Amino acid sequence: MATKSFTEQVEEIKNSSASVASKKRALIRFGLTSYEADIILKDFNIKADSDAYTFGVEIECLVQRGVVTAKAREFSVPISYEGYNHRDNKHYFKFVSDASIRGENPIECVSPILSSKGGFEKLENCCNALNEAGAAVNKSTGLHVHIGAANLSGWQYCNVFINYQRLEKIIDTFMAASRRESNNIYCKTLLNECLANCDDMYDVLDVFGRSRYYKVNPCSYMRHGTIEFRQHQGSTDFEKISMWVKFCAKLVKFSKNNRLQEDVSSINDIPFLTQKEKAFFNKRANHFANN
């Protein structure tokens, strides 16, 4: 009898008839942290609402500490300055150091876990505070988006990477040149990797050499129960950030039931976008084509 994968065993616990408390204890015994178990069970409890999801953003930028602290208070944005860490939280935006950012006053603004049902307002307030504080971005800064994905099966998880690979050439058209192809060592292309034989998370991890520095990070699932999208250039513009968050969330949702069989040839052919969203990304592609 074939040994069940990690994802299959987690799914078995999650879908059992036991109480939520019993499921949490079982997940912790299985090796997950209390936080990871909470995320998995939270996603399970809201999955009946197909449009609901959790997300988080990491905004790399340059901004003076004292100024942004004052502006955060004005916009009622809870913040905390911390050293470099990967701890998740549900209550405040944390500012951490990031050695990859070049320039004066480099910082990474990491959001708390946000919900699609209300989280965008909190994100907009944070962007307003950053912009009022004079935050700037450059070629060394990026925007990382995490989408809650703890309820994905192995097949669905693989689909996210395969589908992004099928979309990557089109996504490159509405990204800055510094984030296209493999122009950035912190978000390398997926196009050179063979994913066709992947069946679960561990197969994908092996293909990517267990490195997180790809346009889609295969390592964040184990640590956070998320899929991390790393390609977007640095930005403090709420519209650009929120549209990319929604793109990533829709890609994850699409991947639950679909695997693209060939490369997508244009933005207008991306199957999960609305006409309004296609218009936005076409506008971004035109901007980069002319600059």
Regions found by a protein language model. Name each.
Residues R29, T33-A133:
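Terminal catalytic/cofactor-binding subdomain
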Residues N15-S22:
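Charged, low-complexity interaction regions
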Residues G56, S97, W155-S235:
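Aromatic/basic-lined ligand-recognition segments
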Residues R212, R223-E262:
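Beta-strand-rich recognition/accessory modules
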Residues P106, A136-L152, H224-R230:
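Histidine-centered divalent-metal-coordination microenvironment in nucleic-acid enzymes
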Residues T69, S116-C127, A150-A176, D237-V252, ...:
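Helical (often loop-to-helix) elements that flank the catalytic cores of nucleotide-handling enzymes
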Residues A136, K169-N183, K253-A279:
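Flexible helix-coil linker/hinge segments at domain or subdomain boundaries
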